[in-house]
């Protein structure tokens, strides 16, 4: 059951089951071993927390055994939220809620949030919650997965005095983009034309009430403001808890915050390559199973591609363009192969062969290429699953 759900389920459920058992017992024609109705009944007994624990174990082993990339000695933790489209079923609507656009039909959505390591490509923690939950509240739920000695990268939707107070109380550092007109200290900083300054955030009125309602202190917080000029000419202001200019010079923060873009790319991969919105069931339970199962499989693929990338870096050293493993191909190769990896008593040879395939499928990296961002919706219908 667990291995089947980890196998990047995207097609018609009965076809996926037949192919799964064909991998376990190869033959010319896939045999009918388990019916979809039997599977649907059995999966009701599977707690989605099984996949959460698998992911936690994978992450712990990676950071214990592997060479970990850090930024100036700090682990980076990018936190961001998004939404997922869900089946329009009564149970999904009751569990997750809907968005009501002004000029279109209601959409059944879930709010998701991730703690992502942009340097090592791993999702450390993932939450799927009702659409009405806001990203700041989900950030608080992530705090148990955040450790001292790490730095949070936050988008402009997170800054609030109570959020910084919660991080400060737990001695967790941060770097966040802030809107130019939200904070008086930011407006004064911009008006003065300064590039780098330490200022003090003092809570007033609503900010104090928000802290008290959450049991947080209302003491003033010293922060550092840094002006960043983008190639487009746009000015961004970063607010950080890293006050020491010698350890963390101002010019280091633009490249630092740009690293957060890796999380946006991870969300794109999660939605478009892994097809997390292509659900295998319609209930709240099956949605949570699919979500956390695909988080684990994406993470496992990232771990294997990192290992393959070490071979690529060595083999292509001196090339005019650096090369990187093609993650889309790696995810395709994991389909079916993952079943063999997780069911064999000694999968080491298969693991080596898989990593070798990853290392042979690479693409050149050409930095500073810019393309317009196109937003579009590509939905999945429960009754129209792909044949593959």
Task: Describe the function of each predicted region.
Residues 1-17, 32, 43-46, 53-55, ...:
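Single, function-defining residue in the core of a domain
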Residues 59-67, 137:
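A short, well-structured juxtamembrane/interface segment
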Residues 22, 67, 250-251:
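Short hydrophobic/aromatic segments of transmembrane alpha-helices and their interfaces
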Residues 70:
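P-loop NTPase switch module centered on the Walker A-proximal segment
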Residues 26-27, 46-49, 61, 276:
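A short structural micro-motif
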Residues 24-40:
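Short, basic interhelical loop/turn and adjoining N-cap
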Residues 18-24:
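Short alpha-helical "recognition helix" segments of helix-turn-helix
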């Amino acid at each position: 059951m667990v291995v089947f759900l980890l196998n990047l389920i995207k097609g018609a459920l009965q076809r996926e089951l037949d192919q799964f058992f064909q991998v376990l017992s190869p033959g010319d024609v896939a045999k009918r071993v388990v019916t979809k109705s039997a599977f649907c009944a059995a999966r009701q007994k599977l707690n989605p927390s099984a996949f959460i624990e698998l992911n936690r174990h994978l992450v712990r082993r990676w950071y214990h055994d592997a060479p970990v990339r850090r930024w100036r000695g700090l682990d980076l933790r990018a936190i961001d939220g998004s939404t997922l489209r869900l089946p329009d079923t009564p149970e999904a609507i009751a569990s997750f809620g809907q968005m009501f656009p002004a000029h279109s039909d209601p959409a059944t959505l879930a709010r998701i949030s991730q703690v992502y390591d942009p340097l090592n490509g791993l999702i450390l923690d993932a939450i799927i919650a009702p659409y009405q939950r806001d990203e700041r509240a989900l950030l608080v739920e992530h705090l148990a997965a955040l450790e001292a000695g790490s730095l949070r990268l936050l988008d402009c939707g997170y800054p609030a005095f109570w959020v910084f107070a919660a991080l400060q109380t737990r001695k967790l550092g941060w770097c966040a983009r802030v809107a130019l007109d939200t904070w008086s200290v930011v407006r004064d900083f911009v008006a003065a034309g300064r590039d780098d300054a330490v200022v003090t955030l003092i809570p007033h009125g609503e900010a104090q009430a928000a802290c008290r309602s959450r049991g947080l202190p209302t003491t003033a917080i010293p922060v550092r403001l840094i002006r960043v000029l983008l190639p487009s000419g746009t000015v961004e202001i970063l607010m950080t808890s890293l006050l020491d200019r010698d350890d963390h010079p101002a010019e280091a923060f633009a490249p630092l915050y740009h690293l957060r873009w890796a999380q946006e790319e991870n969300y794109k991969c999660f939605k478009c390559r892994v097809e997390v919105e292509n659900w295998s069931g319609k209930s709240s339970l099956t949605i949570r199973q699919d979500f956390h199962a695909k988080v684990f499989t994406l993470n496992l693929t990232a771990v294997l591609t990192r290992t393959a990338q070490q071979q690529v870096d060595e083999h292509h050293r001196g090339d005019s363009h650096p090369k990187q493993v093609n993650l889309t191909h790696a995810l395709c190769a994991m389909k079916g192969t993952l079943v063999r990896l997780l069911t064999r008593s000694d999968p080491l040879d298969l693991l080596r062969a898989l990593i070798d395939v990853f290392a042979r499928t690479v693409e050149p990296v050409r930095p500073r290429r810019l393309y317009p961002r196109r937003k579009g919706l590509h939905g999945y219908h429960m009754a129209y699953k792909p044949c593959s």
